[in-house]
């Protein structure tokens, strides 16, 4: 097997793994629902395709004590919201802000992003190949950033 063929095989395996991660979050969403007393609530809408998401944060001191989302839309938008809530729950607010910036940079195709800092969120990197879907993947993240502004971050 040539180096090129090996690279193509590995890329196909990675794409399949990423699809599995995205589908798992779509079928088994994490942190979907509402919080009883959120510190911040913000709604986001993608008018191009109708995706909707509401992000709720419970902030305790300098960390996200709990997070929830609800919404409707395509598998990309809803999986991204689930993956986001799983990634930020319990994390310091500064880390959440950095993660959001890194995720957004990855979705813009910037090369200065450390893939290891993103964990499973890297599974959404393939969405960049479909520019119209990037808004689906980033909807929850933009909504999170607005919720963070609501709590002064």
Label every PLM stretch briefly.
Residues 1-36, 91-153:
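C-terminal binding/interaction regions
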Residues 80-92:
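Alpha-helical support elements that line or immediately flank enzyme active sites
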Residues 28-71:
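Structured beta-strand/loop patches that form or line metal/cofactor-binding pockets in enzymes
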Residues 78-79, 98:
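Alpha-helical macromolecular-interaction surfaces
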Residues 53, 82, 135:
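Active-site phosphate/pyrophosphate-handling residues
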């Amino acid at each position: 097997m040539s180096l090129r063929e090996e690279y193509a095989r590995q890329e196909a395996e990675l794409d399949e793994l990423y699809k599995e991660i995205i589908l798992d979050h779509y079928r088994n969403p994490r942190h979907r629902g509402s919080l009883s007393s959120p510190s911040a609530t913000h709604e986001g809408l993608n008018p191009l395709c109708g995706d909707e998401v509401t992000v709720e944060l419970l902030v305790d001191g300098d960390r996200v004590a709990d997070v929830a989302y609800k919404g409707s839309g395509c598998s990309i938008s809803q999986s991204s919201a689930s993956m986001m809530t799983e990634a930020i729950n319990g994390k310091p607010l500064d880390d959440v802000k950095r993660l959001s910036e890194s995720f957004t940079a990855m979705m813009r195709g910037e090369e200065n992003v450390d893939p290891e800092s993103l964990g499973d969120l890297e599974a959404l990197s393939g969405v960049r190949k479909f520019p119209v879907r990037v808004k689906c993947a980033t909807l929850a993240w933009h909504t999170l950033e607005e919720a963070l502004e609501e709590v002064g971050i």
